[in-house]
């Protein structure tokens, strides 16, 4: 039985380009972000991948990425389930601020702690621990059972909601997860064992040109 789980961070958004803290704000993808999502779909198709169901957040950049991936794979009508449990981390008072401006206001060390620590939230926002507290129950109760039943599952979401999943899947600690970066538009392909642990993991090489 194949137990396939593919995680994909959304393509570059307009606020990624402007270096703004995004969180639950809802910007669109840039042209590059659209290209990244389409490229991810082409790569997955080239690997012979097909999905039975897709999950995404309530935010447009993840939904658009999900639809573009599926469109490139010829699966545009696939069942797609949206849930705010997969939303990006809420950056609270940082939302909408330029990252350099935030550093000037609060200092490099404080902003770095808010961004990269596991359990220190920005004012009015969520820490990665808080994000994991909503992502992981949804994964365990809703997504994982479908993977374990043999369905091939795509999750198109966000850097921090996916970091919460990768921390569990890859057995990372709260310290090692701090340095993990998940690139926009790069699928992480997991195959799981019967005990739900990881059998294999494949990552799209950013340097591969899928148009060749």
Swiss-Prot record:
Which residues are named in the active-site annotation? 10, 88
**Native organism taxonomy:** Bacteria, Pseudomonadati, Pseudomonadota, Alphaproteobacteria, Hyphomicrobiales
Q: Which Gene3D superfamilies match?
A: Phosphoglycerate mutase-like (3.40.50.1240)
Q: How does it assemble?
A: Homodimer.
A UniProt-annotated Pfam family: His_Phos_1
Name the InterPro entries for this protein: His_Pase_superF_clade-1, His_PPase_superfam, PG/BPGM_mutase_AS, Phosphogly_mut1
Q: What is this protein called?
A: 2,3-bisphosphoglycerate-dependent phosphoglycerate mutase
Q: Which GO terms describe its biological process?
A: gluconeogenesis; glycolytic process
Q: What does this protein do?
A: Catalyzes the interconversion of 2-phosphoglycerate and 3-phosphoglycerate.
Which SMART domains does the record associate with it? PGAM
* Gene of this entry: gpmA
- Source organism per UniProt: Methylorubrum extorquens (strain PA1) (Methylobacterium extorquens)
């Amino acid at each position: 039985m194949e137990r396939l789980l593919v995680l994909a961070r959304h393509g570059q958004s307009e606020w990624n380009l402007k270096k703004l803290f995004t969180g639950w704000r809802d910007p669109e993808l840039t042209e590059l972000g659209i290209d990244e999502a389409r490229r991810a779909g082409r790569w997955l198709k080239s690997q012979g991948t097909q999905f039975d169901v897709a999950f995404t957040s309530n935010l447009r950049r993840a939904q658009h990425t999900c639809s573009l991936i599926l469109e490139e794979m010829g699966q545009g009508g696939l069942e797609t389930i949206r849930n705010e449990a997969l939303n990006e981390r809420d950056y609270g008072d940082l939302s909408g601020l330029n990252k350099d401006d935030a550093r000037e206001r609060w200092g490099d060390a404080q902003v770095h702690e808010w961004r990269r620590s596991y359990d220190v939230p920005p004012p009015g926002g969520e820490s990665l621990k808080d994000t994991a507290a909503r992502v992981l129950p949804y994964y365990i109760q809703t997504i994982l059972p479908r993977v374990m039943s043999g369905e091939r599952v795509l999750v198109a979401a966000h850097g921090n909601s996916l970091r919460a999943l990768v921390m569990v899947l890859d057995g990372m600690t709260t310290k090692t997860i701090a340095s993990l970066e998940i690139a926009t538009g790069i699928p992480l392909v997991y195959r799981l064992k019967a005990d739900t642990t990881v059998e294999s993991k494949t990552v799209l090489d950013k340097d591969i040109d899928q148009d060749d």
